Amino acid sequence: MEFDAELDARQLACPLPILRAKKSLAQLTSGQVLKVIATDKGAPKDFEEFCRQTGNVLLSSTAQDGELVFLIRRR
């Protein structure tokens, strides 16, 4: 899937991946997609909750080569 911006949040512990994603999403316009790459094991649950609370859409959450990849569409 195509994305408009990418955030490398590898090696960052909670809550930094969420905080950086929030900042990155603020720079996008409605409908644009942010790709986040993280390694924090709690990130899937954190991003699910973050999107639920903010109204952004978690398009996908996958594991690739020991990394977690999230695609989030800005509301």
Predicted regions and their residues:
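Intrinsic-disorder/low-complexity, polar/charged segments enriched in Ser/Thr/Lys/Arg/Asp/Glu/Gln
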Residues: D4, G31-K35, E67-V69
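Amphipathic, hydrophobic secondary-structure cores in small proteins
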Residues: L12-V57
